Amino acid sequence: MDAPDLHLLLHPRHKEVHDFYAGYEAEIRPHLCDGCNTCAAMCRFDAVEYGTPKPRINPLKCEGCKVCVEFCPTDAISFTPRHCGTWYISHTRMGPMAHAQLFPAQENSGRLVALLRQHAKKLAREQGIRLILSDGPPGIGCPVISALSGVHLAVVVTEPTPSGMHDLARVMDLCGHFQIPVAVIINKCDLSPRIAGEIETQCIQDGHAVVARLPHDSDFVHALVQGRAITEFSSGETVRQIKIAWERIVALVNLPHPGDKARAMGAETLEDPVTEENH
């Protein structure tokens, strides 16, 4: 996700820390620059600022297009891999966790998602874990496609609002393109019972399971403030519905038998199977 918060609940203890690089960034080498400002004139992202006596590149605006590098008459601009953030392998009270933190103004990418999923699968094999939960970002862009690739089930959380219905339809279309089964959770279902009913009806017509209708519950906020999951904080009706939803999700995933190399539920199984679910 672009602004993940799972670490606030799980308090991960880092076992491995790695730098993450994606794309490239330009940087002017002052000792080679003659101050002609050709780079500033050519940049269409206004990343190069006219300088006195020499220009400078604003790294927050640079898109890494390399046009300044190509047109610099004195070869004064370096083009190096962009250090975008840090990724971690951590231990939590609920199991291993592969996650990352990007620097300000750095965008999530399919490459980062794929990297984390790759290491999550490695951890699962090493520790005999049969199920991986991948937290997917909103929308239908590259990070979402990377998060959905090869999963056995997509769990989509929506809300009964016009924008929620619209975004849900887009994600379900994307899952349909990749032949990924979908399970839907309607969050804050009491926000608009009418729209919640329309969502459920549409899901049934499209063959998607609605595994839970969760009411608005302030216990989510109270649990988050204490750094705990709601299932650790409360035992009310919402928690009961969440546990029922989890049982339904596990049943839908239908874990493959060890050694079965066949494709299961539209996703590729592994020789030592690790079922992956996108949430």
Describe each region flagged by the PLM.
Residues 27-46, 56-76:
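Cysteine-centered iron-sulfur cluster-binding motifs in ferredoxin-type domains/subunits
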Residues 74, 81-89, 111, 115-213, ...:
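Conserved catalytic-core segment of NTP-binding enzymes
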Residues 40, 49-52, 58-65, 69, ...:
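Phosphate-binding/switch loop-helix module in NTP-utilizing enzymes
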Residues 174-279:
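C-terminal lobe/tail of nucleotide-utilizing enzymes
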Residues 5-8, 38, 42, 67, ...:
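Alpha-helical scaffold segments in soluble metabolic enzymes
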Residues 34, 38, 63, 104-111, ...:
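Conserved active-site and cofactor/substrate-binding residues in soluble primary-metabolism enzymes
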Residues 61-99:
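Hydrophobic alpha-helical segments and helix pairs
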Residues 1-23, 51-61, 65-66:
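Walker A/P-loop NTP-binding active-site region of P-loop NTPases
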